[in-house]
């Protein structure tokens, strides 16, 4: 059976989603989860774009052992050199080099002729091949490129040493039949096409990214470029989880297989959602909360009699546990450690001790601790280790229907260890909290977005708040989890500011590194 490779671009194209700004530690956590998921290639970033991206890609390449790590580059020597330096210590360094090929891009962006683009593409693929064992070449805006010219340039970059040819629908324009026909055309008109793997990269501007990717597979594509939860620039990329499950459930039709560990899908989706701040819609295929819910009476009756009447995907297949085991205040360290292992977390003894303490504190407020609660604890604590910015200490809010809400907040400056306490009012309780926090902080902060959802079920479910703020003209997302909505709101705000300060700290370190070197 033919094998389909999954090239995941969550950390590169996915991070280009508006409002998403992952720090290096968060990217590494996501990369490790993608490795557990079983993707074949992780596109970790664009090393030449910034020193921060370079170091992030380098760390991921040095850490990941069970799949290839790729970096993006333009057809420019400087980009290729930067990518090699970032990736050379990886298991299988892979370059993803691209140049636009459509007439509209050649005329308005590159200001080059077709002949000049062919010459540049061939020269840079040859240059890259001197370093990289695997070179993937992309024809940016392939779907609006003249097919005869596309076939010509593809043939020449294959002769230059490309191992993978990517034909992206950069603007999400084509219908599935049209996109599939491009792969068919390449198969029929490029003499050396059998020497390479063909790759599909689809955007969801017209809602057809997954359908187009599957059409590419039907017409000979060997690799699919995806992002977890379908995140990405504009309307997003093809959703990894939807394609992986479709290929599995309809193996009879597609006759292909992959290395994706389907039972890791839900946790991967949760990890990406929590760190990116992009909430998964309830009706999202495969990973949405409603994906396995049945409300219609007729559907419920049939489902209870025989699941397969209305359920083609079992929750267990994608890692949605139906295990009702819960932990509580009487659960010991061993039970906690065992549950962490069951959930797939590999923790050191030091981490277990720290997380167990957080867990015990939560049991004083919440009777039953679910898997969702545990995952939230781990994800929040894992990125709270760097002692930069502010530590949230306490919050008190006074509210009455006929009174102006007043908040009192205590924060600790983690650099000076000074405890800062302020009070302020607001039109509502959340505004009062945020006005108070701003009085505690030196930064000028503008709140752009505020979202809240429950984590788990029941009246004692944890509140999960996501905010997007602008500081010094830069957007940063923050996340906070607590049993109380106002505490979660405060933590999300502090988290966003701390992420901004960590980003600034990283830039300072990078500038110091440049000065030394």
Swiss-Prot record:
Q: Which reaction does it catalyse?
A: 3-methyl-2-oxobutanoate + acetyl-CoA + H2O = (2S)-2-isopropylmalate + CoA + H(+)
- Localization (cell): Cytoplasm
Which UniProt keywords are present, listed alphabetically? Amino-acid biosynthesis, Branched-chain amino acid biosynthesis, Cytoplasm, Leucine biosynthesis, Manganese, Metal-binding, Transferase
- Which residue intervals define the domain Pyruvate carboxyltransferase in the entry? 4-266
Q: Which cofactor does it need?
A: Mn(2+)
Which residues does the record give as Mn(2+) binding sites?
Answer: 13, 201, 203, 237
Q: In which pathway does it act?
A: Amino-acid biosynthesis; L-leucine biosynthesis; L-leucine from 3-methyl-2-oxobutanoate: step 1/4
Q: What class of enzyme is it?
A: transferase
Q: Output this protein's name.
A: 2-isopropylmalate synthase
Q: Which GO terms describe its molecular function?
A: 2-isopropylmalate synthase activity; acetyl-CoA C-acetyltransferase activity; manganese ion binding
Q: Which Pfam families does this entry report, sorted A to Z?
A: HCS_D2 (PF22617), HMGL-like (PF00682), LeuA_dimer (PF08502)
Q: Which GO terms describe its biological process?
A: L-leucine biosynthetic process
Quaternary structure note? Homodimer.
State what this protein does.
Catalyzes the condensation of the acetyl group of acetyl-CoA with 3-methyl-2-oxobutanoate (2-ketoisovalerate) to form 3-carboxy-3-hydroxy-4-methylpentanoate (2-isopropylmalate).
Q: Give EC number(s), comma-separated.
A: 2.3.3.13
